[in-house]
Curated annotation (Swiss-Prot):
Gene3D superfamilies: 1.10.1390.10, Glucose-6-phosphate isomerase like protein, domain 1 (3.40.50.10490). This is Glucose-6-phosphate isomerase. The gene is pgi. Disulfide bonds: none annotated. GO terms for molecular function: carbohydrate derivative binding; glucose-6-phosphate isomerase activity; monosaccharide binding.
Length: 545
């Protein structure tokens, strides 16, 4: 057993699972439960009263956090200590949204001035493009941005841009390309005019396979449409650490934006990786996004554990994963603009906490990162909500909704809100056999049929959920929401004693993919591989089954 599972608090939590009443009873016996199990921070409101938790549960979870030195680990991250131990790096995405007056040291150097310089450079670039001063090779202004990246350099900008659609500058559109499947970029290029398109290539090394391949394809398309090599600088910019490769490609050194080792890809939208966001919504709104995240940073760093929103959410998710064998967690967004968030949180959480050894290399003997999935309300209610209500697996849920809509048409938002709140009530309350039978009392069914149908209509309830509300979806509330989930992820990794900031599984996949590519290209013999891989490669070479 690991030190974590040997601890008295862990053992107490395990025993405590046997003594919890149904949530129906918890609400029936405590009129103040909603008031006592909800809090506001940074423009967000969290109702966590519909959880399998009592005051004793929470005290035990806070004790577990203290046993795991969570508060010290939070301070270590904000102080720029080397908490990504396998790569010997600080973890300072929080510095990207810090105030100019702050001083944050990484590798013996204050990094805030460089962050502020980059923001100023972004502002100048954004104003040049959005004002129409930036001209393409035929003298026309830019109308379309194509953001080329992969992983964090793709998903973050795409999801945030999608979420902030009401704030977009008129006359500018953005397209996101990540997948190396040629169909993805081909379909995008069909929509574009080479004279008015600007490509943003985001890759720390300027060599990420998918990103480089897509960028080379974009360049070939641009040249085929009439552009010259000397025109590339008017239509391509880069976010990269490899200035040499970018300039060799044809990008002007003045149009290369930096990336830093102390920012992981899945935490990078706050940096120049967010350039597509800034172009679409303007720098004032981009800074508001940063400010919302900064407010959540301040809350996370200073609020007591019992009043700390990321801590509470992280602990409750851990509670279900480690003590109720919950293998997944669903994120349900009741706002069309937020429909991309489940995929973003999926990458954030699963890439961070999909680990199986502790910091000192010991195999864990407890579950770590759950499968994060979800979708858009109310669509999911007519699909996978059925599994959450009546399936055998326990699936904790987060419901996210703004109180005010950007598009208040008729009764739409009232119906959306009623569905959101109704789902959380149904998950908590369920339906007993007696209630189901009573509903069938006036039907024409026989007594025997009523008994049978009632059994099928029973729902156990006691299904946990959090509800997150905001007044309205704005750049600031969105920034706070994303930072909330970043810190929630950190909380769990800190307690599990794993490194939430490396991704060796991703790296292995890259390496093996390159190896297979060489074999597909017949540069290497594939016969030494396992029979399955060799057989698949040979079928691909043949081009037919």
């Amino acid at each position: 057993m690991t030190l974590l599972t040997q601890s008295s608090t862990w053992q107490a939590l395990s025993a405590h699972t046997q003594n919890l009443p149904h949530m129906r009873e918890l609400f029936a016996t405590d009129a103040a439960r909603f008031k006592n199990m909800s809090l506001s921070a940074c423009g967000l409101f969290l109702d966590y009263s519909k959880n399998r938790a009592t005051a004793e549960t929470l005290e035990l979870l806070f004790s577990l956090a203290k046993d795991s030195q969570l508060e010290a680990k939070i301070k270590a991250m904000f102080a720029g200590e080397i908490i990504n131990t396998t790569e010997k790096r600080a973890v300072l995405h929080t510095a990207l949204r810090s105030k100019a007056s702050q001083s944050i040291i990484a590798e013996g150097q204050d990094i805030v001035p460089e962050v502020q310089q980059t923001l100023s450079k972004m502002q100048e670039f954004v104003e040049t493009v959005t004002s129409g001063q930036w001209k393409g090779y035929t003298g026309k202004a830019i109308t379309d941005i194509v953001s080329i990246g992969i992983g964090g350099s793709f998903l973050g900008p795409k999801v945030v841009s999608q979420a902030l659609r009401p704030y977009w500058n008129q006359g500018l559109n953005c397209h996101f390309v990540a997948n190396v499947d040629g169909t993805s970029i081909s379909e995008k290029l069909k929509l574009l005019d080479s004279e008015t398109t600007l490509f943003i290539m985001s890759s720390k090394s300027f060599g990420t396979q998918e990103t480089l391949t897509n960028t080379l394809t974009a360049k070939a398309w641009f040249l085929a449409k009439g552009g010259l090599q000397s025109d590339v600088a008017k239509h391509f910019v880069a976010v990269t650490s490899n200035v040499t490769k970018a300039t060799e490609f044809g990008i002007d050194a003045d149009n290369i934006f930096p990336m830093w080792d102390w920012v992981g890809g899945r935490y990078s939208l706050w940096s120049a990786i967010g350039l597509p966001i800034a172009l679409l919504v303007g720098m004032d709104n981009f800074r508001a996004l940063l400010n919302g995240a900064h407010q959540m940073d301040e809350h996370f760093a200073s609020a007591p554990l019992a009043e700390n929103m990321p801590v509470i959410m992280g602990l409750l998710s851990l509670w279900y994963g480690n003590f109720f064998n919950a293998q997944s967690h669903v994120v349900l967004t009741y706002d069309h603009y937020l429909r991309g968030l489940p995929a973003y949180f999926q990458q954030l959480d699963m890439e961070s906490n999909g680990k199986s050894v502790t910091l000192d290399g010991t195999d864990v003997d407890y579950s770590t990162g759950p499968v994060i999935w979800g979708g858009e309300g109310t669509n999911g209610q007519h699909a996978y909500h059925q599994l959450i209500h009546q399936g055998t697996a326990l699936i904790p849920a987060d419901f996210i909704m703004p109180l005010q809509s950007h598009n208040p048409i008729g009764v739409h938002h009232d119906q959306l809100a009623s569905n959101c709140f109704g789902q959380t009530q149904a998950l908590m309350q369920g339906r007993t056999f007696e209630e189901a039978l009573a509903e069938l009392a006036n039907s024409s069914l026989t007594d025997e049929e009523k008994q049978l149908i009632a059994k099928h209509k029973v729902m156990p309830g006691n299904k946990p959920s959090n509800t997150l509300l905001m007044n309205k979806l704005t750049p600031e509330t969105l920034g706070a929401l994303i930072a909330l989930y970043e810190h929630r992820t950190f909380v769990q990794g800190a307690i599990w004693d794993i490194n939430s900031f490396d991704q060796w599984g991703v790296e292995l996949g890259k390496n093996l993919g390159n190896d297979v590519l060489a074999r597909i290209s017949a540069e290497q013999d594939s016969s030494a591989l396992d029979a399955s891989s060799n057989g698949l490669i040979n079928l691909y070479r043949q081009g037919a089954i």
